[in-house]
Amino acid sequence: MRSNMLKIIVGLILIVCWMSTSRAQQVKHPSLLYTSERISQAKLRIQQDSVWARAWEEIKQTADEELGKKRLDKADYLSAVFLMTGDKRYFDKLREILLHIVHSKAWASSEMLARNPAWRADLNVAHKAYLSAIAFDAAYPELSAGERKQIAKGLYRLGVEPLLGDWLCEPTRIHSLNSMGHNWWTSCVCMGGILALSLQNELDEARKGAQTVYEYLPEWFSFAGDELQQKAKSFDEAGGMYESLNYANFGIQEALQFFVAWTNVYPGSTLPDIPQLKHLSSFFAHVCYPRTGILYNINFGDSHKNVAAESSLMLLYALGIRQPDMLWYIRQVEQGQHRDGYFRNRPMGFFYTPDLKGAPDVPALAHSQLFADFGWATMRNSWQKDASMLAVKSGHTWNHSHADANSFILYHKGVDIIKDAGNCWYPNPQYRNYFFQSQAHNVVLFNGEGQKREQQYHGSTLRGYLYNLLDGGNIKYVLANGTGPVSDHFSRNFRHFLWMDNVIYLIDDLKTHEYGEFEWLWHPGGEWKKRGADVTITNGEAAVVVRPLYPRLLALSDFVHDYPNDLYWEEISAPTEDLKGTETYYSLHLPGKFDRVKGVTAIILKDSVGQKELPVMEKREGKDWIGLRITFQGKVTDLYINQLADGRLMHSNSWIEADGWNTDAYLFAVTYDEGEDPAKPKEVFVAYGSALRRNSDSYFSSLSKLFYIQKGDAKKLDLWISGQPLVNAYFRTGKRPVFLNVNGEKATVNYKEGLVKVKYNH
């Protein structure tokens, strides 16, 4: 206790000493972002590399075009060129702009000022503060003392005081992290902080403001959300932010720019302890899709697939948080592929793009990742370009996070072959009437309805969740629970994503409070063509087959009246994301009214558009179970769905007998060679089971129900297990394995009478 108290006292003394030193320290301009070190590196680059020389010429051309104007918009270009060349023409223009803008009455918009209480600072004010800081920092050495003071006072009044006053500092603060703690908060606070850093030689209140930003910024990263207004935790434990890639990157970028400026102004200073920073790089990598051409990124929510996060990664790299996958990611981004990027021909990209020569060919990351805190998951078969990737979302709904619980996007051979409809400019009625709503996503509707429209503004009190991600190579699985957001209609809205070899099975477990009509929505990212009971979606070299299997097949022909019990389809016209036209999405309707449905749809990933041979899928049923037998290229998989394991039983366990297998598992699959004995499977998948038996033999036993994948050969047994922190389970193998891997880690082989015992506590 005494030791801890001593440490606290010493720490407080050091902080006081540092703050006293920083108050006395004069900032040597320019030192915010375009530092002398960055300038020297850039000059060397353009001498050695023609690509960088061309980028420099484009920056200079933009600055030259601004010499005949008097606007702040491109002050960063004027500043960069002045610092690179020393040409006083650019300084004169910066000086003219700065002396002009400080006479403005206010930077806030009339719409923001009309709010109650008035919002004196928004993103526009933040952007002007940033550009003003860059301009003042660059021009500072050439300005007279009187000009410095005049400009500093004006910029403090216009930028620092409203930004930090509204968003951070007492007694004028009107915002909290609970009400506006998303990307706006970091932009307003951190751009106000950067401007304050630039003004502190002239104004001690600016110095204090910058220190306040430095002190409170870690709280934004650590915000845990709340219950009363259903605000999401900002950052997932595995990295990343729930708002969508677009706004996650923007909010993070603004925070990191402040930290970079701070460490430049105060050399030798250290970053606060922010654990979330170390996971950002892997988050951005996991939600991207490398392809031939522009790098795609998951566009859940208010993002676009062209938007990338190279800016945040460059800033992390500049701060010394360096991981090889950062370089890999930055190298994938094409110049100019989105609006706000750090590209070579823009000042921040010009100064902060790291040397990419050491970038790996592929990142050293797992093929699958679950972001459980905000309900995203990605699964891919490779990190190579144009591979296959499935992205799943079931999490929060509010603001930039759409009404898309249990939705997904499928990327295959370079395209989003099953896509998200996207978004548009927010004031457009199509945004709130279509793009935000369930109808714009690949979900199940009941009586034509998905999530309530009010969730856009008020959020969903009950959110969606993702659980039990498993990746066993050719077998991958994740469970989505979207019941909460649609609980006005549904008591069960579960969607299982089971990816086995070249087929992804969507298994929907649906229960509603009353009888009604179910429909499945599909947003194709290519040409939709029905052939019999299958639908083929084709885009360039990519093709997938969508094959509904349960509760009914798709009606075989357009004469749907001849197939009164089968699924019929509806073509629905909707706006394209750019609002320049319309596109068609599809609804597959189940005739009749039901209150409980099991839906199974197979999505077959074709190796080529012309591939003729496809997996043969035989529908099979028994007492209390439904299933499939899938045969393809000498391999057979028997897939079983336990009808008793869907919550209909209270205290009785859900035991079934299926083809000689006895189990309480919700879902299980066994794979074996064609013509061989199913009792000797090469691969086993079990979802939510405590036992799998055949005859008198136990194949799997656990007191608690688990999810697992089992694969092995004569020497090795691989197990991937989820479902409980404490596992004490047995798995059957033919012989004692030499090696045992559990969840990718080596484990001790504990073998007896044909069973391997696995015990751990996580």
Regions found by a protein language model. Give the residues of each.
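CBM-like, beta-strand-rich accessory domains located in the C-terminal region of large
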Residues: 24-25, 332, 424-762
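Bacterial Sec-dependent N-terminal signal peptides
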Residues: 1-26
